[in-house]
Design a protein with these regions (language model features):
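Acidic, metal-ligating active-site segments
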Residues: 51, 58-71
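A short catalytic or substrate-binding loop motif that flags glycine-/basic-rich loops and adjacent residues
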Residues: 39-40, 56-60
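Acidic active-site catalytic centers that drive phospho-/nucleotidyl reactions
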Residues: 49-51, 118, 141, 205
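Acidic, Mg2+-coordinating catalytic module of metal-dependent nucleases/exonucleases
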Residues: 110, 159-227
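Two-metal-ion RNase H-like nuclease active-site motif
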Residues: 43-54, 202
Length: 227
């Protein structure tokens, strides 16, 4: 499975005034300025979304994952389970091996409620399969920026996208819906059409999220922390 890229001692007779430059080790910080975080020339950031068979990671599996490098024209990286394999757990493990490796190529990640769902889900499922979870990264969870700066009736990504599309309908796609039919169709019926629908939904969510990041740029935290 893969994604679809000296010391000097002066003489007593002739003392020389010498300035010794000591190179200090670079200081590593747990946070980064948000402007640097958003600049693709300085920081490589993944916009991430996953789709799962359950909201809880002890009973559910990851069906697909989509990554896009923030602020670039790179292709969307998609990884999904293969329904032709009877062992979906082995498929999920293979997916995670690819996803975790790919995430290590990034300096940071953008999600929507991902600090509470996507990232913990990936970590839990990785531990389940005996895999090393992705390392801590600078993480922007846009949900909490939306929560802090707006007051719509719902803070779901779908509603935020609806609001943003009123003034600029071409900036992001309309958000599709997922329900019992799609999830059950994949997990219990191994319906490839349903899986394709879920993958397209996941890609659209990443596009919507990336657009929202730029629209909320002025309201982001001044520093992006690791989590």
């Amino acid at each position: 499975m893969k994604f679809e890229d000296n010391e000097m001692t002066p003489s007593m007779e002739n003392t020389i005034n010498t300035a010794v430059i000591i190179e200090k080790p670079k200081k590593t910080t747990k946070s980064i300025n948000s402007e640097i975080f958003l600049d693709p020339n300085k920081t490589k950031v993944a916009v991430l979304d996953i789709e799962t068979s359950s909201l809880k990671s002890d009973f559910g599996i990851i069906i697909c994952a989509v990554l896009h490098t923030l602020g670039t024209d790179e292709k969307y990286k998609v990884c999904a389970i293969d329904l032709a394999n009877k062992d979906l757990l082995s498929e999920e493990k293979a997916l995670l091996e690819v996803l975790n490796t790919e995430l290590e190529n990034y300096d940071g990640v953008v999600t929507y409620f991902g600090s509470r769902f996507d990232i913990p889900f990936i970590r839990t499922r990785s531990l389940y399969h005996g895999l090393q979870p992705p390392s801590k990264k600078r993480s922007l969870d846009l949900y909490f920026t939306v929560k802090r700066t707006t007051n719509p009736t719902s803070r779901r990504l779908e509603r935020i996208n609806d609001i943003l599309r009123i003034s600029d309908p071409d900036a992001s796609p309309d958000k599709t819906r997922l329900g019992m039919k799609e999830w059950n169709g994949v997990v219990f019926n191994r319906d490839s059409k349903m899986l394709d629908y879920i993958v397209e939904h996941c890609i659209a969510d990443v596009k919507i999220l990336e657009n929202a990041v730029w629209r909320f740029k002025d309201f982001l935290p001044e520093r992006i922390m690791r989590c």
